[in-house]
């Protein structure tokens, strides 16, 4: 299947046998960094409430199982021991591109289901585009930050931009707030952080810099908040039922989703949400990264 498309309506059933139940897999370790999600890992009570609310909407029993990290969760998916998985965007896309899972819905937080990685500078700094960078001091969040390091660097590689030419001093500041302050105080010429996008996926509606006056130098995305992915072993009719139940939630499922994922709702995962990130996937430099949380580091 590869990455030929994300919408289950366009796929043939890969399994003819209806499942007896649906097994939801989650990584239980608290997140290292979360934007809009929970600051702690999921609880058993929250997982149970979500499963109870989803079950009558899909007409199947729904159970949950916790895993130590995403590698263990994906291994269970590959063995056929889990059917659904909450995944960070990069993990979800790699699994989908390998033909193992299918992204089906994205959670909405703060009115949006995605964000972007933005490279920004102070207003009036004289840097207006990526071509203006020559030995610039750059502020990163940390080596595991999707928006604050990984994605914008991957995008720059895809544009054949030479890091050794563009950047001089490179510093990890540990948080998005610290990156913003480093740029605004003049400690760094540019910094990388998150920016929430409007529904057109082009315009910034809010960002880590708040109301400060900044100049966006480059932006890469959209990046989904996180992704509910289904095993390709599930019949497409079951995947559609799960997708439709989450997109058109009843009150019980809405409350359970808010409790578990801090989600206001869900949208169906479409190719337009995923393809920009897929294009830079091979340029990522996160080899050996071990993600552990139900909510992705951003």
Question: Which residue ranges define each predicted feature?
Answer:
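Glycine/small-residue-rich loop that forms an oxyanion/phosphate-binding "nest" at active or ligand-binding sites
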Residues: 94-120
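Periplasmic-binding protein-like
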Residues: 19-23, 27-29, 110-121, 206-243, ...
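Solvent-exposed coil/turn segments that connect beta secondary-structure elements
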Residues: 29, 90-91, 122-124, 143, ...
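Pocket-lining segment of extracytoplasmic ligand-binding domains
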Residues: 137-139, 143-237
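N-terminal hydrophobic or amphipathic helices and topogenic motifs
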Residues: 1-80, 254-298
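Flexible hinge/capping segments at coil-to-helix
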Residues: 121-142
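Short helices/loops that flank or line small-molecule/ion binding pockets
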Residues: 71-85, 98, 131, 175-196
